[in-house]
Amino acid sequence: MCIRDSTCELSMQIGRAAAMVLTENLSHRPKVMIGMDTRASSEMLEASIAAGLCSVGADVLLLGVVPTPAVAFLVKEYGYDAGVMISASHNPCEYNGIKIFQSTGYKLPDELENEIESIILDDAKVPPVMIGGDVGRITRSDTAADDYIKHVLSTIDVRCENLKIAIDCANGSSSVSAKRIFESLGADCIIINAC
């Protein structure tokens, strides 16, 4: 879902609806991770999606700024029920988007996406906000980017010694990983437009 003029209200509704769908399909409290890119609206959307998820009882792990493939990998690696990536990929910076991954690291099936959309469009389906111990908890990961970088490096069987590489991170989420990955492979890196 790509959103122009993203709002806290809409992203909170997405979080609530996603938590409701997960709760209906699981026998335990849902665990959802959230990663984001570096767009100006990403932190705002992260907070409102997390609030929506927690308000319907899901526990949330905030990954911080990570590339989209990191969420797809880490949701499976950490054993989470779903992963959310806040990013509009190649779209202009005033846009933002929300991608939801299932526990396998693949996108949610269309039927679950349609169910989430149906709940958002029919607010009567959304359960009341939980209170007390039923409210989900939010924690932050200090190791998400490191865990993803270790995984990427474990899949690459190439060395880059004697290479000088220029990387334009375009002020995006690869800013947290590109230099570390290429330098670990032996490259001499020149990085521009890194956050």
What are these regions (language model features)?
Residues 14, 68-71, 79, 106-108, ...:
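Residues in flexible loops and secondary-structure boundaries
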Residues 6-9, 66, 118:
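Short alpha-helical interface patches
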Residues 19, 26-104:
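Ferredoxin-reductase
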Residues 96-195:
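Gly/Ser/Thr-enriched, mixed-charge loops and adjacent short helices
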Residues 4-51, 55-56, 134-164:
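An N-terminal, well-structured beta->alpha segment
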Residues 8, 42-43, 69, 110, ...:
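Loop/helix-junction capping segments adjacent to catalytic residues or to phosphate/diphosphate-binding pockets
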